[in-house]
Structure formats: structure tokens, C-alpha cells
């Protein structure tokens, strides 16, 4: 598993599995989402551990981007996980261009949700970037 796209997709699947069953063993989850006899890529661990450890910060940054009256609990689980993953890459993976992180999140939404969700994810992440002062 060499492509970042495939690793990102595996990270989404692992995060979804862990959100569904927080008691699950991460190594067992990685074994489920990776092809058989595949070593766990370092970037997969970085994404999963990063999103989990920064989840409160990510959620706090996402909440103001939602429309009035909306909360994170109202989002579907796939959409929330995709938003967290995309925002994690935007905020913490400096080598990842913001536009690429958004594009990857949109692709995940198209695959694991629907076109409406893809537009929603695009809007939320783009709004976050616009609202964030550039260094």
C-alpha cells in the first residue's frame, strides 16, 4: 500500500471502525482495513493516532463552520470522520497542500457517502481555510 490516497482511505475505514467500537484493538482494526500481509504504513498510524489525539481540537475548529442550529452530533458518522481527517491533514500535515487535503476529503465523501456530502465537506473545509489567518 504505497499511495497516500489508499492510506487515507484505510485511515477513514479504521477511524470509522474505532468510532463504532472504541474498545477495538487498533492492530486488529489495521489488519481488517489493509490487504493481507501488509505492513502498517507509518502515515496510516500518523493519521489515525493524530485524528484520535486531536479530536477535541478538530471538533472545536469544525463547530463554528456549521450552519446556525447545527452541531457535530447531527452529522452522519462518515461525514464527521471525513471532516476530522481532512481538517487534521490541513492543520497538522504541513507537507500536505490544503487544496489536496480538501480534494481527498471530497473523494472519500463521494465514495463513502454521497454527492451532497461531498459538497458539504468541500464547503466546511473551504470555509475553515478562509476563516483561518495564513501564517
Swiss-Prot record:
<protein>
    <recommendedName>
        <fullName>Transcription antitermination protein NusB</fullName>
    </recommendedName>
</protein>
<keyword id="KW-0694">RNA-binding</keyword>
<dbReference type="InterPro" id="IPR006027">
    <property type="entry name" value="NusB_RsmB_TIM44"/>
</dbReference>
<keyword id="KW-0804">Transcription</keyword>
<keyword id="KW-0889">Transcription antitermination</keyword>
<dbReference type="InterPro" id="IPR011605">
    <property type="entry name" value="NusB_fam"/>
</dbReference>
<dbReference type="GO" id="GO:0006353">
    <property type="term" value="P:DNA-templated transcription termination"/>
</dbReference>
<comment type="function">
    <text>Involved in transcription antitermination. Required for transcription of ribosomal RNA (rRNA) genes. Binds specifically to the boxA antiterminator sequence of the ribosomal RNA (rrn) operons.</text>
</comment>
<comment type="similarity">
    <text>Belongs to the NusB family.</text>
</comment>
<dbReference type="GO" id="GO:0005829">
    <property type="term" value="C:cytosol"/>
</dbReference>
<dbReference type="InterPro" id="IPR035926">
    <property type="entry name" value="NusB-like_sf"/>
</dbReference>
<dbReference type="GO" id="GO:0003723">
    <property type="term" value="F:RNA binding"/>
</dbReference>
<dbReference type="Pfam" id="PF01029">
    <property type="entry name" value="NusB"/>
</dbReference>
<keyword id="KW-0805">Transcription regulation</keyword>
<dbReference type="GO" id="GO:0031564">
    <property type="term" value="P:transcription antitermination"/>
</dbReference>
Amino acid at each position: 500500500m504505497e499511495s497516500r490516497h489508499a492510506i487515507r482511505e484505510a485511515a477513514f475505514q479504521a477511524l470509522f471502525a474505532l468510532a463504532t467500537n472504541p474498545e477495538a484493538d487498533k492492530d486488529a482494526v489495521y489488519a481488517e482495513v489493509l490487504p493481507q500481509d501488509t505492513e502498517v504504513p507509518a502515515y496510516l498510524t500518523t493519521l489515525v493516532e493524530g485524528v484520535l489525539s486531536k479530536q477535541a481540537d478538530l471538533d472545536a475548529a469544525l463547530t463554528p463552520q456549521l450552519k446556525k442550529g447545527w452541531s457535530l452530533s447531527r452529522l452522519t458518522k462518515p461525514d464527521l470522520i471525513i471532516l476530522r481527517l481532512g481538517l487534521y491533514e490541513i492543520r497538522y500535515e504541513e507537507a500536505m497542500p490544503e487544496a489536496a487535503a480538501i480534494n481527498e476529503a471530497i473523494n472519500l465523501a463521494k465514495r463513502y457517502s454521497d454527492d451532497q456530502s461531498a459538497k458539504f465537506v468541500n464547503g466546511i473545509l473551504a470555509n475553515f481555510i478562509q476563516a483561518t489567518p495564513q501564517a
